[in-house]
Amino acid sequence: MSERETRGANEAIDFNDELRNRREKLAALRQQGVAFPNDFRRDHTSDQLHEEFDAKDNQELESLNIEVSVAGRMMTRRIMGKASFVTLQDVGGRIQLYVARDSLPEGVYNDQFKKWDLGDIIGARGTLFKTQTGELSIHCTELRLLTKALRPLPDKFHGLQDQEVRYRQRYLDLIANDKSRQTFVVRSKILAAIRQFMVARGFMEVETPMMQVIPGGASARPFITHHNALDLDMYLRIAPELYLKRLVVGGFERVFEINRNFRNEGISVRHNPEFTMMELYMAYADYHDLIELTESLFRTLAQEVLGTTKVTYGEHVFDFGKPFEKLTMREAIKKYRPETDMADLDNFDAAKALAESIGITVEKSWGLGRIVTEIFDEVAEAHLIQPTFITEYPAEVSPLARRNDVNPEITDRFEFFIGGREIGNGFSELNDAEDQAERFQEQVNAKAAGDDEAMFYDEDYVTALEYGLPPTAGLGIGIDRMIMLFTNSHTIRDVILFPAMRPQK
């Protein structure tokens, strides 16, 4: 047996011994009465204590004689004979407990407290003071074990480094890593701020079906399920777009939804099959209005959640206080591949040859517009580091967007990029029912030619358009990618609490 194998075997033995020891302690607790009490109440969290009392010195705290109660997980313990120091962690952070034998009821210190384990959840009551080093602490007069932890914290809780464990057992990650906890706190704040931003501008939050008979609103491969009572195959939605625009037809002129979409695609640092999107639709607006709204949204979120319009992501700093760059798709191709002959982008054969020369495999179902878009993706997208709007997307890759009045081969559409990745997609909506029917048919033809991501024909949506959709603009923003930016996270798994993972064998 190698040294590594020997060490691993010894660690397994130690773990099993500790597990058995903790279960024996729980068995003893059961014999004594209620093993999992639920009658302890706290009056402060750790962050509330720090915010309210950190500025006071020890003399002032002693004169005030402030009694508080807290509860949380015991993360560290230093036993020094008749007294100990404990670090207690709760939702707000950490607070130090000073536990002295003579300050507790008889027997509590030696017979109970010293037998507890790291990871146990405890309640404490006592008076506030500051140590000689100035650390706010609680001099405990009452200690109670509220939940016995049967499993030891990993690595004595010096940190959880195994990425697979972090994602599979997110509860351990949240216990172990301050950054992970803060990431999801920021996520929650951003979602709340988005809702406040939208409602303040007259938008109504709605909910639309997660299971659909016809998946629409995006080009993607859907998940399929079966409704037993209806004996009907259904699809987890890939986007809420068509239902939201039905609501605009019905008279709700400004609507938005923040919810999950599902796409049966690969997993990467940028992609999770289950992800969160915000989509919004506003009547009597065009894509220029959406560009202004998007800039304002990101600027507001940065200022309100982070306290600054400057956001650091890796080695880059994004200043959302400045106007964002705007380029057409063709301008971006020329900027990042200067040798491109722009005339090649107007001819199918020339564009196909150009695409193949830079490593793109051109599918039979692709037209000129799709090829130009793929060229843009290959040569320009990774360079769009600072906030940038790309406009003038080909109609072929924009089946739901309004055609441009001057050039019907392109649409009044933009995509929004930061850090070399797409964050949002918006456009003036196609509200010509006959044009929409033709584009749906083109998508059906593409699907028949082998494009698995082409859209289905949605007859009811065409019917809705026939009743009249007012001039409307719509925007979708990937919330997970947005959170990655605001938390300086470099994989989408770091911002989704429970990301998709291959089952362990």
UniProtKB/Swiss-Prot annotation:
This is Lysine--tRNA ligase, heat inducible. It catalyses: tRNA(Lys) + L-lysine + ATP = L-lysyl-tRNA(Lys) + AMP + diphosphate. Keywords: Acetylation, Aminoacyl-tRNA synthetase, ATP-binding, Cytoplasm, Ligase, Magnesium, Metal-binding, Nucleotide-binding, Protein biosynthesis. One of its GO terms (biological process) is lysyl-tRNA aminoacylation. InterPro entries: Aa-tRNA-synt_II, aa-tRNA-synth_II, aa-tRNA-synth_II/BPL/LPL, Lys-tRNA-ligase_II, Lys-tRNA-ligase_II_bac/euk, Lys-tRNA-ligase_II_N, Lys-tRNA-synth_II_C, NA-bd_OB-fold. Its cofactor is Mg(2+). The gene is lysU. The modification N6-acetyllysine is found at K114, K156. It comes from Escherichia coli O6:H1 (strain CFT073 / ATCC 700928 / UPEC).
